[in-house]
Each structure stands twice: as C-alpha cells, then as structure tokens.
C-alpha cells in the first residue's frame, strides 16, 4: 500500500488469543512508546513482558501486552477483538466499531461508594479526572445527585492526557447524600451522566 496514506497501526500480542488492536496512527504518534521496563526493572510477565505498547489517551485495553508485531495500514483490520468483543451497542440494536479514545471522565475515590461516614462535619471529597483528548479544565462536584454542582480544586501540574487529582470541601450535616463528579476538558467536552449515555447508546 501507499505509505503516505497510512492512517492506522495494528498491534498484536503473543498471548494465547493473539490480542490484536487497531489504533489511529495520529494517536500512536502522540507520545506513544513501546515499554520494556517499569519502576527501574524489566516489565513483569503479568504487565506484558518483554514489550508492551503504551498509547496515552487511548483506553488501556489497546495497550497490547506481550507485543510481537506492529503493522501500519490505510484502513482498520477489523480483528476479532474489534468486531466481536469490543463494540459499542446502539439503541436501534446495531453496533459500531469500538472507540478506543478515552473520553473525559472523573471518579470520586473518597468517600467511596457505599461507605458509611462515621462522623458529621468536614470531609474532603477527592477523586481523579482525565481526558484522552487534552487537559482537564475543570471538575464539578454534586452532593445531591446532580441537582446542584459546585467547582472543585485541581491539583497541579495539570498535564496533557494525564490524571488530575481534585478536591472538594464538604461539611456533612448527617443528611442522605449522593456524591457525583463531572469533568470538562480542554475541547469543551463535558462528562455525561449515565442516563445521558443510555439515551445515546442504549446500554
């Protein structure tokens, strides 16, 4: 094929199922790397020894472990892992090819889901936010199930396609509370609620 028309990268693993993923070349050329070590030592087998593909902004399932082959092409390969296992179901029953880009997301890590607070008063609501398309611009927190939102503080540095820690000061008076967070990234994308996702995707 004409290499000037290349748009996608195929990554294949050496595991028993030959895990294979197609990644947009634009993402693969944006700070991607082939890792052979972690924390000053060789990759451990469970983490993909001897080689693992790392692509910032792309979901971890596309960070192929036990990497044995990379191939460049001008159209997706439609591997079994992309047409049978990893697809997005739509409301009308059809499906679309799995989207591997990490949309802007956030999660509250403390207090964690289902946790019973032992005392009323001050609590630091904290969590992580990230975006596969840019940087975290702001995070908002709701303590009443999404009826009202207030801005959280962001820890620095705030880096491109990286986790960002956030904090929200909350004084709990003992009432029932439903904690939620939502992030807005540098593209203007706002993290949707689960109800909004179900309306769009049907699942």
Located regions from the model:
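Structured, non-membrane catalytic/scaffold regions adjacent to prosthetic-group chemistry
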Residues: 1-203
